[in-house]
């Protein structure tokens, strides 16, 4: 069980009424708290929770339409996302109890200071390198629309500026990361057809390809509901058409692809997690059509080339700069 869940269950008597658990991990916490519902923005966690606790877990970027008298927020990595979630929950909890739980190395002590605007916070417990905080919401705020927290910026590309819309919690929120910047310089001679932007984030790669290769069909895939929402906003801001889907890894992707583009993720919250990236590399051949191509950027220290060669039988380095490499392989 997640150590944060274990800290909550040390105070289980507090959580026996109608409860919403935001950012709930895919463990047995709902099994221990029968009147609780979960809200998650991670498609993989949603699939696991829904399989075990059907109808009690809700996926998306908005507070789910369920009744609750108290709420727990599992602190996310992003400060901007934490602020959005605290506001969204507190706006529904006038006079109710809001709890915040997180790891010390994830910044729980600093995040708990944001509870002061809502009432008088107090630390209830500290164990398993985690802390649990509580506040009675005396000053319920007005809910802020998610789009009001969007960061908008323009990327100057060869074929003109691309408008990017990023949301709290999305990778490299409000700016272009170095890996994607390098890959954007090496998008020439791409195969035309069905293109997948894997781990799409704010949709930079997918939108760029759709504009440059308008005859291609673009599908964008991410595990995070906020990334899915941001990618849709980026497409709309540039008057482009594309399909944006949520799913946990390459298994959720369509088949018969002409191209897979990616700056694959290797973090889950504050933890390193290579599983999604390694599955992409190992299973790419199952989703590419014959002659289809995979082109991705990754940190130079990651040993991805042997995995790509094992899956597709070939791999070459197209470019290397700023600690990143671009790999290209063909099925």
From Swiss-Prot:
Subunit structure as annotated in this protein's UniProt entry: Monomer.
UniProt-recorded Gene Ontology molecular function terms: 16S rRNA (guanine(1207)-N(2))-methyltransferase activity; nucleic acid binding
GO cellular component assignments: cytoplasm
Protein role: Specifically methylates the guanine in position 1207 of 16S rRNA in the 30S particle.
Source organism: Pseudomonas putida (strain W619)
Pfam family, one: MTS_N
CDD domains on file: AdoMet_MTases
Name of this protein: Ribosomal RNA small subunit methyltransferase C
Family to which the UniProt record says this protein belongs: Belongs to the methyltransferase superfamily. RsmC family.
Catalytic activity: guanosine(1207) in 16S rRNA + S-adenosyl-L-methionine = N(2)-methylguanosine(1207) in 16S rRNA + S-adenosyl-L-homocysteine + H(+)
First-tier enzyme category under EC: transferase
Residues in the signal sequence: none
Keyword entries, A-Z: Cytoplasm, Methyltransferase, rRNA processing, S-adenosyl-L-methionine, Transferase
EC numbers: 2.1.1.172
């Amino acid at each position: 069980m997640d150590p944060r869940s274990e800290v909550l269950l040390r105070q289980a008597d507090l959580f026996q009424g109608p409860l919403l658990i935001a950012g709930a991990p895919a463990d047995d916490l709902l099994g221990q708290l029968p009147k609780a519902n979960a809200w998650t923005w991670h498609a993989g966690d949603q699939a696991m929770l829904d399989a075990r606790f059907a109808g009690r877990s809700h996926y998306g970027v908005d507070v789910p339409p369920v009744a609750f008298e108290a709420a727990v927020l599992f602190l996310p990595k992003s400060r901007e996302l934490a602020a959005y979630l605290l506001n969204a929950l507190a706006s529904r909890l006038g006079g109710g109890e809001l709890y915040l739980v997180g790891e010390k190395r994830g910044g729980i002590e600093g995040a708990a200071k944001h509870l002061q605007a809502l009432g008088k916070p107090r630390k209830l417990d500290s164990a398993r390198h985690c802390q649990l905080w509580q506040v009675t919401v005396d000053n319920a705020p007005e809910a802020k629309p998610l789009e009001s927290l969007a960061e908008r910026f323009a990327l100057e590309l060869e074929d003109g500026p691309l408008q990017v819309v990023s949301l709290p919690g999305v990778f490299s929120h409000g700016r272009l990361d170095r890996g994607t910047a390098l890959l954007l310089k090496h998008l020439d001679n791409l195969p035309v057809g069905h293109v997948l932007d894997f781990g799409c984030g704010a949709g930079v790669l997918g939108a760029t390809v759709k504009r440059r290769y308008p005859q291609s069909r673009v599908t964008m895939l991410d595990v995070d509901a906020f990334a899915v929402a941001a990618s849709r906003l980026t497409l709309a801001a540039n008057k482009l058409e594309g399909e944006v889907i949520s799913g946990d890894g390459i298994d959720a992707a369509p088949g018969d692809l002409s191209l897979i583009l990616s700056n694959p993720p290797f973090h889950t919250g504050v933890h390193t997690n290579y599983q999604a990236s390694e599955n992409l590399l190992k299973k790419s051949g199952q989703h590419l059509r014959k002659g289809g191509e995979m082109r991705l950027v990754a940190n130079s220290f990651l040993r991805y080339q042997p995995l790509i060669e094992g899956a597709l039988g070939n791999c070459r380095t197209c470019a290397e700069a700023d600690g990143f490499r671009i790999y290209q392989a063909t099925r």
